[in-house]
Amino acid sequence: MSQSYINVVGAGLAGSEAAYQIAKRGIPVKLYEMRGVKRTPQHKTSNFAELVCSNSFRGDSLTNAVGLLKEEMRRLDSIIMRTGEAHRVPAGGAMAVDRSGYAQAVTAELENNPLIQVIRNEVTEIPDDAITVIATGPLTSDSLAKKIYKLNGGEGFYFYDAAAPIVDQSSIDMDKVYLKSRYDKGEAAYLNCPMTKEEFIRFYEALINAEEAPFNSFEREKYFEGCMPIEVMAKRGIKTLLYGPMKPVGLEYPQDYKGPRDGDYKAPYAVVQLRQDNAAGSLYNIVGFQTHLKWSEQKRVFSMIPGLEQAHFVRYGVMHRNSYIDSPNLLAPTFATCKNPNLFFAGQMTGVEGYVESAASGLVAGINAVRRFKDEEAVIFPQTTAIGALPYYITHTKSKHFQPMNINFGIIKDLGGPRIRDKKKRYEKIAERSLKDLQQFLTV
């Protein structure tokens, strides 16, 4: 086995982060990426760290678990966080990016790093020539997936991810929508499409009766709750959308609103939000409207949304299969495999769910691949931190109940002592302790 470089397979969020962390520590990297020579069903470009589902890195507040994780990653010099900050677009209290400019910048930085050799080629075998980080993501090619499944005891776990449609801003009827962020948090960053009760019921009936695209015969429906198709969510009951992506709370009508409304109510019955998708503000995605409907049905049903009657859809919603391994049986909290300490996994295939979580796993895997390379003790971050709690959770939960997991305060080690009833204050205390413990851990 070579002791002159480390392999990273896959240049998505996790692989890009891992490659950067390895090179930053002075170790040469061979970074393999098949896009450029082989397409995937979901990606549109050959850029590294391409965002395929949404352009949002979610909430920024430290009272939000993903906000805490992002802050920890910033303190660990994450290329994904740093580049994301440089390509932010307005999104209220969330962090959203111009997905094209952001991905191009990550690609350029890694391609121009003298310690990183980019190899545009499909990897069909698990490399054994050097320490290796596999970060091929939910769209792992079939040939490599078969080899990974052998490690997985011949089992293949998966669920379905769906992406929301994107519309051309110039085709939105701006007289029917208004600009506002929920509860007026941050700047007014979302275009809101308000619905009366009658409009919502008409839309709901069309949605639950719309025709879905077919699954392959060997596939069955299995969804991750955080990226569930809007039509599947709707079929759980008419109120589901009103407490989910179409909830009107905190999105009251502006004073100059002249459109239809239910009596004297200050807020709509339901709201569809549109979020800016690029820096120029020429594209908007329909927030929370991941879908598996046929494209013709998407056009028909989503054109019922006020303001989108004449909308030009530059991308329809699509769905892909998202594979993940049995991390509780296969991985250590370092992201190395238990049976082969020279083989690491990172990203969504480990069972972490979300852009930020994927990048965080790549950061930890990259650091530990270097530690292995130098024959040093692996780093396991404290369970009191978000970046330590996530790998601990995916490697210690009961295998038969294992499902992909977003970061949340429920998996971070409890504060202990009397429980603080006020949720915001409790989360503030957890975040304060996390950042303090991380700083202490890094100085040691």
Swiss-Prot record:
Class of enzymatic activity (EC top level): transferase
Classification via InterPro entries: FAD/NAD-bd_sf (IPR036188), MnmG-rel (IPR002218), MnmG-rel_CS (IPR020595), MnmG_N (IPR040131), TrmFO (IPR004417)
Gene Ontology MF term list: flavin adenine dinucleotide binding; tRNA (uracil(54)-C5)-methyltransferase activity, 5,10-methylenetetrahydrofolate-dependent
Cofactor: FAD
Superkingdom, natural source: Bacteria
Subcellular localization, as worded in the UniProt entry: Cytoplasm
Enzyme Commission number(s): 2.1.1.74
Catalytic activity: uridine(54) in tRNA + (6R)-5,10-methylene-5,6,7,8-tetrahydrofolate + NADH + H(+) = 5-methyluridine(54) in tRNA + (6S)-5,6,7,8-tetrahydrofolate + NAD(+); uridine(54) in tRNA + (6R)-5,10-methylene-5,6,7,8-tetrahydrofolate + NADPH + H(+) = 5-methyluridine(54) in tRNA + (6S)-5,6,7,8-tetrahydrofolate + NADP(+)
Pfam families: GIDA
Binding of FAD, residues: 10-15
The entry's keywords: Cytoplasm, FAD, Flavoprotein, Methyltransferase, NAD, NADP, Transferase, tRNA processing
A GO biological process held by the record: tRNA wobble uridine modification
GO CC list: cytosol
HAMAP family: TrmFO
Family according to the record: Belongs to the MnmG family. TrmFO subfamily.
Biological function: Catalyzes the folate-dependent formation of 5-methyl-uridine at position 54 (M-5-U54) in all tRNAs.
Protein name: Methylenetetrahydrofolate--tRNA-(uracil-5-)-methyltransferase TrmFO
Native species: Streptococcus mutans serotype c (strain ATCC 700610 / UA159)
